[in-house]
Regions:
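Acidic catalytic/metal-coordinating carboxylates
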Residues: 32-35, 58-61
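Charged phosphotransfer/docking patches of two-component systems
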Residues: 10-14, 82, 105
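Two-component/phosphorelay signaling modules centered on CheY-like receiver
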Residues: 10-28
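Receiver (REC) domain switch/output surface
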Residues: 91, 104-116
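Hydrophobic/aromatic residues positioned on beta-strands within the core alpha/beta folds
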Residues: 75-78
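Conserved sequence signature across two-component system core domains
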Residues: 6-7, 30, 48
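Active-site residues of response regulator receiver
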Residues: 51
């Protein structure tokens, strides 16, 4: 089963997808929340790596509208005390909050694969 990488930054998406591929896993990608919801509603994923701050729909809105019970790994540079971050972390589907920038992208792959 595939993973879904959702981030508006092309370099981050491609880096994560490449790291998962090197570990033998396939990924789909979405560059915003609207694309993510379309893919989530259409396909089944092992887990979702979801950015918070994105155009069209942000990560918080994706979680609110997402009906499937899929493990979610939040990937974000945002570390402020925004109320949405508290709601995101309280969502039972959120397994881990991963801060950008990533020091070791392969440790993220191990973490996600190990927890799904």
């Amino acid at each position: 089963m595939k993973f879904l990488v959702v981030d508006d930054e092309l370099l981050i998406r491609k880096s994560l997808i490449r790291a998962f591929a090197m570990a033998g896993f396939e990924c789909d990608e979405a560059e915003n929340g609207l694309q993510a919801l379309e893919k989530i509603n259409r396909y089944n994923y092992r887990a979702i790596l979801l950015d918070v701050i994105m155009p069209d729909k942000n990560g918080y809105e994706v979680l609110l509208e997402m009906k499937k019970q899929i493990p979610v790994f939040i990937i974000s540079a945002f570390t402020g005390d925004d109320t949405n971050i508290g709601y995101i972390q309280a969502d039972p589907r959120v397994v881990e909050y991963i801060s950008k920038p990533f020091e070791d992208i392969f440790s993220i792959v191990k973490l996600v694969v190990g927890k799904t």
